[in-house]
Protein backbone atom coordinates (compact mmCIF):
# COMPACT_ATOMS: atom_id res chain seq x y z
CA UNK A 1 0.00 0.00 0.00
CA UNK A 2 1.37 3.42 -0.96
CA UNK A 3 2.00 5.70 2.01
CA UNK A 4 -0.45 8.61 2.11
CA UNK A 5 0.09 9.88 5.64
CA UNK A 6 3.19 9.96 7.83
CA UNK A 7 3.39 10.39 11.60
CA UNK A 8 5.66 9.77 14.52
CA UNK A 9 4.13 7.04 16.67
CA UNK A 10 4.07 7.02 20.45
CA UNK A 11 2.90 3.59 21.73
CA UNK A 12 2.95 4.51 25.42
CA UNK A 13 3.65 2.27 28.40
CA UNK A 14 0.30 0.44 28.52
CA UNK A 15 0.38 -0.60 24.88
CA UNK A 16 4.06 -1.51 25.02
CA UNK A 17 3.61 -3.54 28.19
CA UNK A 18 0.20 -5.21 28.48
CA UNK A 19 -1.68 -4.47 25.28
CA UNK A 20 0.42 -5.87 22.44
CA UNK A 21 -2.73 -6.82 20.53
CA UNK A 22 -3.63 -3.13 20.28
CA UNK A 23 -0.25 -2.39 18.75
CA UNK A 24 -0.41 -5.40 16.39
CA UNK A 25 -3.82 -4.41 15.06
CA UNK A 26 -2.83 -0.74 14.85
CA UNK A 27 0.18 -1.54 12.67
CA UNK A 28 -1.84 -3.77 10.32
CA UNK A 29 -4.73 -1.35 9.91
CA UNK A 30 -2.43 1.62 9.34
CA UNK A 31 -0.43 -0.28 6.73
CA UNK A 32 -3.66 -1.14 4.90
CA UNK A 33 -4.75 2.51 4.94
CA UNK A 34 -1.41 3.94 3.84
CA UNK A 35 -0.57 5.48 7.22
CA UNK A 36 3.14 5.30 8.00
CA UNK A 37 3.80 5.14 11.74
CA UNK A 38 7.46 5.69 12.62
CA UNK A 39 7.89 4.76 16.29
CA UNK A 40 9.43 7.63 18.20
CA UNK A 41 13.02 6.75 19.00
CA UNK A 42 13.90 6.57 22.73
CA UNK A 43 10.43 7.65 23.91
CA UNK A 44 9.62 7.65 27.61
CA UNK A 45 6.51 7.50 29.80
CA UNK A 46 4.21 10.46 29.16
CA UNK A 47 3.73 11.13 32.88
CA UNK A 48 0.04 10.24 32.93
CA UNK A 49 -2.11 9.02 35.78
CA UNK A 50 -0.52 8.87 39.24
CA UNK A 51 2.65 10.74 38.26
CA UNK A 52 0.65 13.82 37.26
CA UNK A 53 -1.00 13.83 40.69
CA UNK A 54 2.27 13.41 42.60
CA UNK A 55 4.53 15.89 40.79
CA UNK A 56 2.89 17.86 37.99
CA UNK A 57 6.04 19.64 36.86
CA UNK A 58 8.05 16.43 36.48
CA UNK A 59 5.14 14.82 34.64
CA UNK A 60 5.16 17.73 32.17
CA UNK A 61 8.92 17.31 31.78
CA UNK A 62 8.40 13.72 30.67
CA UNK A 63 5.80 14.78 28.10
CA UNK A 64 7.92 17.70 26.90
CA UNK A 65 10.82 15.37 26.15
CA UNK A 66 8.57 13.23 23.93
CA UNK A 67 7.28 16.33 22.15
CA UNK A 68 10.83 17.55 21.57
CA UNK A 69 11.83 14.18 20.13
CA UNK A 70 8.82 14.26 17.80
CA UNK A 71 9.67 17.80 16.69
CA UNK A 72 13.14 16.63 15.66
CA UNK A 73 11.42 14.21 13.27
CA UNK A 74 9.20 17.03 11.91
CA UNK A 75 6.07 14.90 12.11
CA UNK A 76 2.93 15.18 14.21
CA UNK A 77 2.59 12.58 16.94
CA UNK A 78 -0.02 9.81 16.85
CA UNK A 79 -1.05 7.94 19.99
CA UNK A 80 -3.54 5.15 20.67
CA UNK A 81 -3.95 5.80 24.40
CA UNK A 82 -6.32 8.63 25.43
CA UNK A 83 -4.43 9.13 28.71
CA UNK A 84 -1.25 9.76 26.71
CA UNK A 85 -3.22 12.05 24.40
CA UNK A 86 -4.51 14.11 27.32
CA UNK A 87 -1.16 14.38 29.08
CA UNK A 88 0.88 15.24 25.99
CA UNK A 89 -1.75 17.74 24.81
CA UNK A 90 -1.92 19.33 28.25
CA UNK A 91 1.86 19.87 28.20
CA UNK A 92 1.59 21.32 24.70
CA UNK A 93 -1.07 23.78 25.89
CA UNK A 94 0.85 24.74 29.01
CA UNK A 95 4.00 25.49 27.05
CA UNK A 96 2.11 27.45 24.39
CA UNK A 97 0.38 29.53 27.07
CA UNK A 98 3.63 30.28 28.89
CA UNK A 99 2.81 28.38 32.08
CA UNK A 100 4.82 28.59 35.28
CA UNK A 101 6.66 25.43 34.20
CA UNK A 102 7.86 26.72 30.83
CA UNK A 103 11.23 28.08 31.97
CA UNK A 104 12.05 24.99 34.03
CA UNK A 105 11.03 22.64 31.23
CA UNK A 106 13.08 24.59 28.70
CA UNK A 107 16.16 24.38 30.92
CA UNK A 108 15.71 20.64 31.47
CA UNK A 109 15.36 20.01 27.74
CA UNK A 110 18.45 22.09 27.05
CA UNK A 111 20.44 20.00 29.52
CA UNK A 112 19.48 16.95 27.43
CA UNK A 113 20.46 18.71 24.17
CA UNK A 114 16.81 19.12 23.23
CA UNK A 115 14.49 22.05 22.59
CA UNK A 116 10.82 22.40 21.78
CA UNK A 117 9.25 25.19 19.73
CA UNK A 118 5.64 24.00 19.96
CA UNK A 119 5.12 22.84 16.38
CA UNK A 120 3.85 19.32 17.14
CA UNK A 121 0.19 18.35 17.28
CA UNK A 122 -0.72 15.22 19.21
CA UNK A 123 -3.56 13.13 17.76
CA UNK A 124 -5.37 9.91 18.53
CA UNK A 125 -5.33 7.34 15.74
CA UNK A 126 -9.15 7.30 15.66
CA UNK A 127 -9.11 11.01 14.80
CA UNK A 128 -6.59 10.43 11.99
CA UNK A 129 -8.56 7.56 10.44
CA UNK A 130 -11.91 9.34 10.50
CA UNK A 131 -10.82 12.89 9.67
CA UNK A 132 -7.75 12.38 7.45
CA UNK A 133 -8.24 9.00 5.79
CA UNK A 134 -12.02 9.25 5.56
CA UNK A 135 -15.03 7.07 4.88
CA UNK A 136 -14.40 6.28 1.22
CA UNK A 137 -10.90 4.94 1.79
CA UNK A 138 -11.94 2.92 4.84
CA UNK A 139 -14.88 1.35 3.01
CA UNK A 140 -12.64 0.50 0.03
CA UNK A 141 -10.54 -1.82 2.22
CA UNK A 142 -13.42 -3.94 3.53
CA UNK A 143 -13.22 -7.64 2.61
CA UNK A 144 -15.42 -9.14 5.33
CA UNK A 145 -18.96 -8.19 6.32
CA UNK A 146 -19.79 -7.75 10.00
CA UNK A 147 -23.40 -8.69 9.32
CA UNK A 148 -25.68 -7.55 12.14
CA UNK A 149 -22.90 -7.29 14.75
CA UNK A 150 -24.23 -5.02 17.51
CA UNK A 151 -21.46 -3.15 19.30
CA UNK A 152 -21.21 -0.71 22.21
CA UNK A 153 -18.78 2.08 21.20
CA UNK A 154 -16.87 2.91 24.37
CA UNK A 155 -14.83 6.13 24.31
CA UNK A 156 -13.92 6.41 27.99
CA UNK A 157 -13.45 9.73 29.73
CA UNK A 158 -10.18 11.08 28.29
CA UNK A 159 -10.45 11.11 24.49
CA UNK A 160 -12.54 14.28 24.42
CA UNK A 161 -11.89 15.76 27.85
CA UNK A 162 -10.76 18.26 28.95
CA UNK A 163 -9.99 19.90 25.60
CA UNK A 164 -12.82 18.76 23.30
CA UNK A 165 -10.51 18.85 20.28
CA UNK A 166 -11.43 15.41 18.92
CA UNK A 167 -15.22 15.47 19.37
CA UNK A 168 -18.00 16.64 21.67
CA UNK A 169 -16.96 16.25 25.31
CA UNK A 170 -20.13 14.52 26.49
CA UNK A 171 -21.64 12.94 23.38
CA UNK A 172 -18.87 11.95 20.94
CA UNK A 173 -19.83 10.17 17.72
CA UNK A 174 -16.50 9.72 15.94
CA UNK A 175 -16.16 6.03 16.89
CA UNK A 176 -19.83 5.37 16.07
CA UNK A 177 -19.19 6.69 12.55
CA UNK A 178 -16.17 4.48 11.99
CA UNK A 179 -17.96 1.37 13.25
CA UNK A 180 -20.82 2.05 10.86
CA UNK A 181 -18.35 2.47 7.97
CA UNK A 182 -16.94 -1.03 8.56
CA UNK A 183 -20.41 -2.59 8.77
CA UNK A 184 -21.03 -2.94 12.51
CA UNK A 185 -24.18 -1.66 14.22
CA UNK A 186 -23.44 0.72 17.13
CA UNK A 187 -26.14 0.52 19.79
CA UNK A 188 -27.37 3.41 21.89
CA UNK A 189 -24.81 3.60 24.72
CA UNK A 190 -25.49 6.53 27.09
CA UNK A 191 -22.41 5.78 29.23
CA UNK A 192 -20.00 5.74 26.29
CA UNK A 193 -17.96 8.70 27.58
CA UNK A 194 -18.10 7.82 31.28
CA UNK A 195 -15.18 6.58 33.39
CA UNK A 196 -14.40 2.85 33.50
CA UNK A 197 -13.04 3.06 37.03
CA UNK A 198 -9.47 3.73 35.91
CA UNK A 199 -6.86 3.33 38.62
CA UNK A 200 -9.56 3.11 41.28
CA UNK A 201 -9.16 -0.64 40.82
CA UNK A 202 -5.89 -0.20 42.74
CA UNK A 203 -7.02 2.36 45.33
CA UNK A 204 -10.78 1.90 45.88
CA UNK A 205 -11.80 -1.32 44.19
CA UNK A 206 -15.45 -1.24 45.28
CA UNK A 207 -16.01 2.11 43.58
CA UNK A 208 -14.03 1.06 40.50
CA UNK A 209 -15.96 -2.18 40.09
CA UNK A 210 -19.22 -0.28 40.48
CA UNK A 211 -18.33 2.00 37.59
CA UNK A 212 -17.35 -0.96 35.42
CA UNK A 213 -20.56 -2.78 36.34
CA UNK A 214 -22.62 0.22 35.22
CA UNK A 215 -20.90 0.19 31.81
CA UNK A 216 -21.38 -3.54 31.31
CA UNK A 217 -25.03 -3.37 32.34
CA UNK A 218 -25.70 -0.43 30.03
CA UNK A 219 -24.09 -2.21 27.07
CA UNK A 220 -26.01 -5.41 27.74
CA UNK A 221 -29.36 -3.69 28.30
CA UNK A 222 -29.00 -1.89 24.98
CA UNK A 223 -28.38 -5.08 23.04
CA UNK A 224 -24.61 -4.92 22.52
CA UNK A 225 -22.92 -8.23 21.75
CA UNK A 226 -19.45 -6.81 22.37
CA UNK A 227 -17.77 -3.63 23.57
CA UNK A 228 -15.36 -1.73 21.32
CA UNK A 229 -12.64 0.28 23.04
CA UNK A 230 -10.03 2.88 22.11
CA UNK A 231 -8.17 2.98 25.45
CA UNK A 232 -5.87 0.29 26.90
CA UNK A 233 -6.85 1.02 30.52
CA UNK A 234 -10.57 1.02 29.70
CA UNK A 235 -10.09 -2.21 27.78
CA UNK A 236 -8.34 -3.87 30.72
CA UNK A 237 -10.98 -2.80 33.24
CA UNK A 238 -13.98 -3.68 31.10
CA UNK A 239 -12.62 -7.09 30.08
CA UNK A 240 -10.39 -8.25 32.94
CA UNK A 241 -12.67 -7.30 35.82
CA UNK A 242 -15.90 -8.85 34.58
CA UNK A 243 -15.34 -11.84 36.87
CA UNK A 244 -14.81 -9.57 39.88
CA UNK A 245 -17.90 -7.56 38.97
CA UNK A 246 -19.91 -10.78 38.77
CA UNK A 247 -18.72 -11.88 42.22
CA UNK A 248 -19.46 -8.54 43.85
CA UNK A 249 -22.84 -7.83 42.25
CA UNK A 250 -24.18 -11.32 41.49
CA UNK A 251 -24.19 -10.64 37.76
CA UNK A 252 -23.17 -12.94 34.92
CA UNK A 253 -21.41 -10.71 32.40
CA UNK A 254 -19.38 -12.41 29.67
CA UNK A 255 -19.19 -9.62 27.12
CA UNK A 256 -16.31 -9.84 24.62
CA UNK A 257 -14.19 -6.69 24.35
CA UNK A 258 -12.23 -5.68 21.25
CA UNK A 259 -10.09 -2.72 20.27
CA UNK A 260 -11.50 -0.67 17.41
CA UNK A 261 -8.40 -1.54 15.38
CA UNK A 262 -9.03 -5.26 15.88
CA UNK A 263 -12.57 -4.97 14.52
CA UNK A 264 -11.29 -2.88 11.62
CA UNK A 265 -8.63 -5.50 10.95
CA UNK A 266 -11.23 -8.25 10.79
CA UNK A 267 -13.28 -6.22 8.32
CA UNK A 268 -10.10 -5.68 6.27
CA UNK A 269 -9.55 -9.45 6.07
CA UNK A 270 -6.77 -10.00 8.62
CA UNK A 271 -6.89 -13.14 10.75
CA UNK A 272 -7.70 -13.31 14.45
CA UNK A 273 -4.14 -14.50 15.11
CA UNK A 274 -2.60 -11.56 13.26
CA UNK A 275 -4.78 -9.16 15.25
CA UNK A 276 -4.13 -10.79 18.63
CA UNK A 277 -7.82 -11.52 19.10
CA UNK A 278 -7.37 -15.09 20.34
CA UNK A 279 -5.31 -13.72 23.27
CA UNK A 280 -8.41 -12.21 24.92
CA UNK A 281 -9.84 -13.34 28.26
CA UNK A 282 -13.48 -13.50 27.15
CA UNK A 283 -13.61 -15.40 23.85
CA UNK A 284 -15.14 -13.55 20.92
CA UNK A 285 -14.66 -16.37 18.39
CA UNK A 286 -18.26 -17.74 18.53
CA UNK A 287 -19.64 -14.22 18.14
CA UNK A 288 -17.34 -13.33 15.26
CA UNK A 289 -17.92 -16.62 13.44
CA UNK A 290 -21.64 -15.94 13.68
CA UNK A 291 -21.38 -12.52 12.04
CA UNK A 292 -18.34 -12.47 9.74
CA UNK A 293 -19.04 -13.08 6.05
CA UNK A 294 -16.79 -12.77 3.02
CA UNK A 295 -17.78 -9.85 0.79
CA UNK A 296 -19.53 -11.07 -2.33
Indicate residue ranges for each PLM-predicted region.
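Iron-sulfur cluster-binding electron-transfer modules in prokaryotic oxidoreductases
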Residues: 1-296
